[in-house]
């Protein structure tokens, strides 16, 4: 038995249809094959055609087309069968209709089939396949709707980086603006789609284009509380912009879309690798060429943020790149933990001041770490649906936290050993008859004797003064 599937088909970008009572029964998907029992009148055939489209009954659609129904038939509010199929991301139906001669460039009041496909409420994989089919039939990626929004803006707004890349590879303009002055980059920043922002920057998006109210994409991101994207757009250098903009269509498709050879042939462009934290940091500084080097040396972002300049040089990072990294660390106020260099344990002349300084620094840094974790706990949202930015799998965070707990336990154990060792040394030193106290110790002892003597004398003097007053009153 086929399960019901609820879905609404609306015009892209929130544009409503001209007629609310259009006769479409959208939302029930029944893949049970149905066949015509005989010739039907024209009106009844059109009604059956609509039901076949809404239920996704491809065999019935083909049979009706064979019976003489035009593939470009317009229904009550002006949509064609191809437009509806694109609105629900039905790849097989789109392919059948195109093969039967459906017009991929059709539009209703400037609402094109391609815009409808890019604004569909399906998975990115299905949307990508529908868009690829339409582009292969010469659909224009730069035709805008009544709000002057182009297909790439809808794809960016809905968070589809692969669709954005495919549209640009077929000639879509990256920096066009809609009626409010929004570009595709502005839409991605507004909605908090980090991967789309990165992809658009690579494709030549201009982050300085302002909306009609004078806001840049970074300001739009900040206003909508997408602080990670705000920082990314603020730090991103011009070397990242337009990285692939001058490539040919074939080169763009090859570089921007990664396919999975283990899947079926019709599952084109089904795999996309998102940027990790390290890649995001490097891309933001225009140092994406360092990605392979750091990964080869197994240097994580956490490790990179704590490396000193000499360590950067040892790992093959040039002086110019070192300056960019150090400047970014300073701008981000990343405090480098400096514990100082302890003398070798083998030496007997261990400086007490230096050792005490190390312990004080260690204690201070532990306090900073505790405060940082407490701050993170208070800032994290309680419910998962409140998380706006794209996160990796929670298992990754859990595993790191487990490792942190283990490291903290190891640290506690080692500090206890250090404490016991120091206590043992102190006891042996106090019980050693041959021990000669240092000058500081002698001086301290003498000062203590003098203080006690002075206090004693003052006490006797005060007592005599009280006794004298008492005697005089009597």
Swiss-Prot record:
It is found in: Cytoplasm. InterPro entries: Ankyrin_rpt, Ankyrin_rpt-contain_sf, Asz1_SAM, SAM, SAM/pointed_sf. The modification Phosphoserine is found at residues 16-17, 19. SUPFAM superfamilies: Ankyrin repeat, Pseudo ankyrin repeat-like, SAM/Pointed domain. GO terms for cellular component: pi-body. Residues 271-333 form the SAM domain. ANK repeats lie at residues 44-73, 77-106, 109-143, 147-176, 180-209, 213-242. Keywords: ANK repeat, Cytoplasm, Developmental protein, Differentiation, Meiosis, Phosphoprotein, Repeat, RNA-mediated gene silencing, Spermatogenesis. GO terms for biological process: cell differentiation; male meiotic nuclear division; regulatory ncRNA-mediated gene silencing; spermatogenesis; transposable element silencing. Its main location: cytoplasm. It comes from the Eukaryota. Plays a central role during spermatogenesis by repressing transposable elements and preventing their mobilization, which is essential for the germline integrity. Acts via the piRNA metabolic process, which mediates the repression of transposable elements during meiosis by forming complexes composed of piRNAs and Piwi proteins and governs the methylation and subsequent repression of transposons. Its association with pi-bodies suggests a participation in the primary piRNAs metabolic process. Interacts with DDX4, PIWIL1, RANBP9 and TDRD1. This is Ankyrin repeat, SAM and basic leucine zipper domain-containing protein 1. It comes from Muntiacus muntjak. The lineage of its organism: Eukaryota, Metazoa, Chordata, Craniata, Vertebrata.
């Amino acid at each position: 038995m086929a399960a019901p599937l609820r879905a609404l088909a609306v015009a892209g970008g929130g544009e409503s249809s001209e007629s609310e009572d259009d006769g479409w029964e959208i939302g029930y998907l029944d893949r049970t094959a149905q066949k015509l029992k005989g010739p039907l009148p024209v009106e009844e055939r059109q009604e059956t055609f609509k039901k076949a489209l809404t239920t996704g009954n491809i065999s019935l659609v083909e049979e009706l087309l064979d019976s003489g129904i035009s593939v470009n038939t317009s229904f009550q509010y002006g949509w064609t069968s191809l437009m509806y199929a694109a609105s629900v991301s039905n790849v097989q139906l789109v392919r059948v209709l195109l093969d039967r001669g459906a017009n991929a460039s059709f539009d209703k009041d400037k609402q094109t089939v391609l815009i409808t496909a890019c604004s569909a409420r399906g998975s990115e994989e299905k949307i990508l396949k529908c868009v690829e089919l339409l582009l292969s039939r010469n659909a224009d990626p730069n035709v805008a709707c009544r709000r002057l929004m182009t297909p790439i803006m809808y794809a960016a707004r809905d968070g589809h980086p692969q669709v954005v890349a495919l549209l640009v590879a077929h000639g879509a303009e990256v920096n066009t603006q809609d009626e409010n002055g929004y570009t595709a980059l502005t839409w991605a920043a507004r909605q908090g789609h980090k991967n789309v922002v990165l992809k658009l920057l690579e494709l030549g998006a201009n982050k300085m284009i302002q909306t009609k109210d004078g806001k840049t994409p970074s300001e739009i991101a900040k206003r909508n509380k997408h602080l990670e994207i705000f920082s990314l757009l603020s730090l991103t250098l011009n070397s990242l912009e337009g990285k692939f903009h001058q490539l040919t269509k074939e080169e763009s498709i090859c570089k921007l879309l990664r396919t999975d050879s283990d899947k079926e042939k019709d599952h084109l462009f089904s795999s996309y690798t998102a940027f990790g934290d390290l890649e995001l940091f490097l891309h933001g500084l225009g140092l994406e060429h360092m990605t392979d080097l750091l990964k080869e040396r197994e240097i994580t972002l956490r490790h990179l943020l704590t490396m000193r300049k000499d360590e950067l040089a040892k790992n093959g990072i040039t002086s110019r790149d070192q300056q960019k990294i150090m400047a970014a660390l300073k701008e981000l106020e990343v405090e480098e933990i400096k514990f100082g260099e302890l003398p070798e344990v083998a030496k007997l002349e261990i400086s007490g001041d230096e050792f005490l300084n190390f312990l004080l620094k260690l204690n201070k840094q532990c306090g900073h770490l505790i405060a940082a974790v407490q701050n993170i706990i208070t800032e994290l949202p309680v419910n998962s649906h409140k998380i706006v930015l794209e996160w990796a799998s929670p298992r990754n965070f859990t595993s790191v936290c487990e490792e942190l707990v283990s490291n903290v336990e190891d640290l506690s154990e080692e500090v206890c050993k250090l404490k016991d060792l120091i206590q043992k040394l102190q006891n042996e030193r106090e019980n050693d008859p041959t021990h000669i106290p240092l000058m500081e110790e002698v001086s301290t002892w003498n000062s203590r004797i003098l203080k006690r003597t002075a206090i004693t004398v003052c006490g006797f003097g005060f007592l005599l003064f009280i006794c004298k007053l008492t005697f005089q009153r009597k």
